[in-house]
Design a protein with these regions (language model features):
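Active-site beta-loop-alpha junctions enriched in small/polar residues
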Residues: 38, 71, 115-117, 209
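Divalent-metal (Mg2+/Mn2+/Ca2+)-assisted nucleotide/phosphate chemistry catalytic cores
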Residues: 82-201, 206
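Short connector loops at secondary-structure junctions
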Residues: 69-82, 207-212
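Haloarchaeal acidic low-complexity proteome signature biased toward cell-envelope/secretome components but also
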Residues: 1-9, 337-343
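N-terminal catalytic cores of NTP/NDP-binding nucleotidyl/phosphoryl-transfer enzymes
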Residues: 11-77, 177-184, 190
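Conserved nucleotide- and phosphate/pyrophosphate-binding catalytic cores
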Residues: 185-343
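Short secondary-structure boundary/capping segments
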Residues: 50, 80-83, 222, 259
Length: 343
């Protein structure tokens, strides 16, 4: 694979690359990338779309580290209680491994690291104090505004959070920082301050945040707005069937976004097209080689919302089926990580 192909593979299905020139320059060597997940609530299909991208990194010859950011999960308004950090970290790692495997990646080639393995080291701690001394309160709050829970009287942990996330890039020796577009503020802070702390400004790749199935932003607290990794085929079908998906409209259409950012990348990796099966009386089977073709047909009215939903539900269930099987084979993971929900 030449440099142009690798660059295209890495930048596809992203919201933003900062910057493409820097990313291209990295490909002359052996770049490394990292993504971090704070083990808080249950993982869902929104996580799957970002984790699927790790298969692209691997195919492009980029070494990947996944940080299970256990300390971050507690620092952000104690979203995860201290006594549940280990259980939730174990659940997150198992889920991420299953998702990457389902997406065609190799979880055994990923380096999984937990925050407490290095974030309590003396060198890391001293560097964090130095960074805290040099960074203003307003700059820190601005960096974390899309990630950390905000209030009129914020906890100190939420202010330490973006400083640590910036330092994680250096500590993990990552050339590329990858995450959702909501992480942009933190990584822009990292690009500013890391050169003053013995590190390099990372290249940043940002994934889009998907709309919820009810329209608008996906909500972890709204059960019907997302598909869980353990949802059975009937639940997947029911949620997709009830999703906001008005004829011809693309904006805030979670069904189309799932198809674009999850289903199509997996199909492309397999060399398969998106197939919509319909009775002959309703026009017969449709085949779409690219997402752009599918979206155009939807906007023009050649693809009915219900036909799209039926096909999307099948492909999504196929994608999460091996993940669901692994997690249901280990019910202890969810019971121990979320005892209030599974007792």
């Amino acid at each position: 694979m030449n440099t142009a192909d690798r660059l295209d593979l890495l930048s596809r299905y992203t919201e933003e690359v900062v910057t493409e020139d820097e990313l291209e320059a990295l490909l002359d060597g052996e770049p490394t990338a990292y993504i971090g997940y704070a083990p808080t609530g249950e993982m869902h299909i929104g996580h799957f779309t970002t984790i699927r991208k790790l298969a692209d990194f691997q195919q492009a010859g980029v070494d990947v580290t996944v940080l299970i950011a256990d300390l971050h999960a507690h620092l952000d308004s104690e979203k995860s209680p201290w006594d549940l950090l280990d259980a939730r970290s174990e659940y997150y790692e198992a889920s991420i491994r299953a998702m990457l495997d389902s997406a065609g990646g190799d979880p055994n080639s990923v380096d999984f690291v937990r925050g407490r393995e290095f974030q309590l080291d003396e060198e890391y701690t001293l560097e964090m104090y130095r960074m805290a001394a040099e960074t203003t309160l307003s700059r820190t709050q601005r960096a974390a505004s899309e990630v950390v829970r905000q209030s009129d009287s914020p906890a100190l942990g939420g202010l330490i959070y973006p400083l640590m996330q910036s330092l994680d890039v250096k500590a993990l020796d990552a050339d590329i920082a990858y995450g959702g577009i909501d992480q942009r503020g933190i990584y822009m802070l990292g690009r500013e301050v890391l050169p003053d702390h013995g590190g390099d400004s990372p290249v940043c790749l940002f994934a889009p945040l998907l709309s919820g199935l009810s329209g608008g932003k996906m909500s972890a607290s709204e059960a019907g707005s997302k598909i869980n990794l353990t949802d059975d085929p009937g639940q997947v079908e029911e949620k997709i069937d009830g999703a906001y998906c008005p004829q011809g409209e693309v904006e805030d259409n979670g069904v189309l976004e799932y198809v674009r950012f999850l289903v199509y990348p997996i199909l492309e990796q397999r060399g398969e097209d998106f197939v919509v099966e319909r009775p002959e009386e309703y026009g017969g089977t449709l085949t779409f080689e690219s997402y752009d073709d599918l979206e155009a047909a939807y906007v023009e009215g050649d693809l009915h919302p219900q036909d799209l939903k039926n096909a999307a539900a099948g492909y999504i269930d196929e994608a999460i089926a091996p993940i669901r099987e692994r997690l249901t084979d280990r019910p202890d993971l969810l019971v121990e990580a979320y005892p209030e929900s599974y007792e």
